Amino acid sequence: MARIAGIDLPRNKRIEIALTYIYGIGRSTAQKILADAGVDSNTRSDNLTESEIARIRENIDKNVKVEGDLRRDISMNIKRLMDLGCYRGLRHRKGLPVHGQRTKTNARTRKGPARTVAGKKK
């Protein structure tokens, strides 16, 4: 079983799909990584040679920010917005949608479960 960026890749999947199990790598990034490493994207992950795994691992370490580093960067960017006190930071701080979505109805994912108000009717 190949272990790349601290993640055990699933055994019997195409390597292009298996790489998407790593946080920060989607289909298009996986295709670019495999093209740069010179590995066929239809190869199953359990059929990879050690040299192919090493080339993929080296390519990811050099060119792509994944897992812990990416999570840390995202949380630091959000923290920076909150410290600045800009509109987006305030929305993050209040737990409301950040990108201009409506909040009179919907937005339940971001706002959490509905809290009913006593005595409020149409």
Curated annotation (Swiss-Prot):
InterPro entries found in the cross-reference section: Rbsml_uS13_C (IPR027437), Ribosomal_uS13 (IPR001892), Ribosomal_uS13-like_H2TH (IPR010979), Ribosomal_uS13_bac-type (IPR019980), Ribosomal_uS13_CS (IPR018269)
Annotated region (Disordered), positions in chain: 95-122
GO molecular function annotation: rRNA binding; structural constituent of ribosome; tRNA binding
One Pfam short name: Ribosomal_S13
Subunit structure: Part of the 30S ribosomal subunit. Forms a loose heterodimer with protein S19. Forms two bridges to the 50S subunit in the 70S ribosome.
Cited PANTHER family: 30S RIBOSOMAL PROTEIN S13/40S RIBOSOMAL PROTEIN S18, SMALL RIBOSOMAL SUBUNIT PROTEIN US13M
Record protein name field: Small ribosomal subunit protein uS13
Organism whose genome encodes this protein: Geotalea uraniireducens (strain Rf4) (Geobacter uraniireducens)
Gene expressing this chain: rpsM
